[in-house]
Amino acid sequence: MYYAGIDYHKRYSVVSIQNAQGQIVQEQRVDHAHPEGFRRLFRECPEPVSVVYESTVNWSWLYEILEPLKNVSSVTLANPFKVRLIAEAQIKTDQISARALATLLRLNVVPACHIPDQKTRRRREVLRQRSYWVKMRTAVRCRVHQILGNQRHLSG
């Protein structure tokens, strides 16, 4: 079994893969503009891979790429607040973060987050967007009322 830690960023990720003894098998930077890099990387592994990365704003994008891969045995979403408590480091680079996540997964001490099913994720996304637009509509209405209220002195 291999263990992969992914340090996930907005435009790229750094992947560190360890074997069962903790030796680094491979480390690679994958640009998000070319997500097939993730597929290729895990397809080339000779053993099943268990993957972990921290929950971020766009976590579901990567999850939907990794979860269906045949060679990926599990995908764990780590709680970023609890992981920081466990893996605090003075010298912090993307590689060190990816290695730390892979090590925590190998030792089975990753504080995991719940991953809702795809239908629930889509519903939440729609509700978030609706909530945003309702807040924007309310803000615009309040602003219009404020502007009109300030114009009363012009009518007399």
What are these regions (language model features)?
Residues 1-156:
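Phosphate- and other anionic-substrate recognition elements at nucleic-acid/protein interfaces
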